[in-house]
């Protein structure tokens, strides 16, 4: 049965060339861009729907950022704490420096002991070390804040291209693994045609050659350039859009309204153009 069907389809292709009709049958195709988040998480907000037009920079979706926001807040709190400690530490260092200077003067006049001077110097060194420690703590907290802010920004995913939203794979409340597509977008530039040329006319096809494209209902023919030729022939193409069966093909179309439509799932409808 499959061999008979393949033979019939092959005759449909070769018949076009024999009848003088040199049209090559094919269909439009498109390379979809799949948009994923670099991190895993629960989808918190979805800002687009299928069929929506988006441009570069438009918000597509966000992931739950509770943990990332908490990490950012903790880093900010550590910075604030370090800055608060720094004020007190600098005051202590200033007092220790004055005491050290005083003890040095007293020692020269013989009014104090070497032990008192050593204690003053030790207090100064301790205060200076505390300043260095607080500086290091603040620097580490700032580095942590930078990382936390970056992780938080990764929870917000924007479009890197313009085009039409083709599909939604995860919706709010669903868990999206890292690097797994959540939204797919078809950029206009990624749309092309795939057509099939009989072997008897294969010599007419060359890379870089211009072709004219016609479609039912189009305002006029289109022009394209051959960009790929298969390395070997195949018996029949996977799908045949012949003149005889073109009218039997149906294409899925979706229509939406703000706030939704007051219909029940499964309710039959008739749609007419306005």
Question: Each predicted region: which residue ranges?
Answer:
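Surface-exposed connector loops and short turns at secondary-structure junctions
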Residues: 195-223, 247-271
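Amphipathic alpha-helical coiled-coil/rod segments that serve as protein-protein coupling scaffolds
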Residues: 21, 55-164, 169
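Short, solvent-exposed secondary-structure boundary/capping segments
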Residues: 232-244
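Short, surface-exposed secondary-structure boundary micro-motifs
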Residues: 59, 65-66, 181, 187, ...
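Surface-exposed patches in structured soluble domains
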Residues: 27-28, 43-47, 53-59, 151, ...
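Exposed loop and linker-edge segments at protein-protein interfaces
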Residues: 47, 53, 65, 169, ...
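Sec-dependent bacterial lipoprotein signal peptides
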Residues: 1-14
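N-terminal beta-strand block that forms a small beta-sandwich/beta-barrel module immediately after a flexible targeting
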Residues: 12-49, 53
């Amino acid at each position: 049965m499959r061999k008979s069907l393949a033979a019939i389809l092959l005759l449909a292709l070769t018949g076009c060339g024999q009848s003088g009709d040199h049209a090559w049958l094919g269909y439009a195709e498109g390379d979809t861009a799949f948009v994923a988040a670099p991190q895993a998480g629960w989808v918190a907000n979805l800002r687009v729907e299928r069929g929506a037009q988006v441009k570069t920079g438009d918000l597509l979706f966000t992931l739950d950022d509770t943990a990332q926001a908490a990490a950012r807040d903790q880093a900010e709190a550590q910075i604030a704490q370090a800055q608060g400690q720094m004020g007190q530490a600098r005051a202590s260092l200033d007092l220790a420096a004055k005491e050290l200077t005083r003890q040095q003067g007293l020692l020269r006049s013989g009014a104090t002991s070497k032990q008192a001077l050593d204690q003053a110097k030790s207090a100064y060194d301790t205060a200076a070390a505390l300043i260095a420690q607080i500086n290091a703590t603040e620097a580490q907290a700032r580095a942590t804040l930078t990382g936390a802010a970056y992780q938080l920004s990764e929870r917000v995913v924007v479009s890197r291209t313009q085009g039409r939203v083709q599909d939604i794979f995860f919706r709010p409340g669903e868990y999206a693994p890292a690097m797994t597509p959540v939204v797919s977008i078809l950029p206009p530039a990624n749309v092309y045609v795939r057509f099939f040329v009989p072997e008897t006319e294969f010599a007419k096809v060359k890379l870089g050659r211009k072709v004219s494209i016609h479609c039912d209902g189009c305002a006029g023919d289109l022009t394209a350039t051959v960009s790929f030729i298969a390395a070997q022939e195949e018996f029949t193409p996977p799908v045949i859009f012949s003149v005889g069966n073109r009218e039997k093909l149906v294409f899925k179309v979706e229509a939406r309204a703000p706030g939704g439509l007051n219909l029940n799932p499964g309710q039959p409808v008739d749609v007419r153009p306005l």
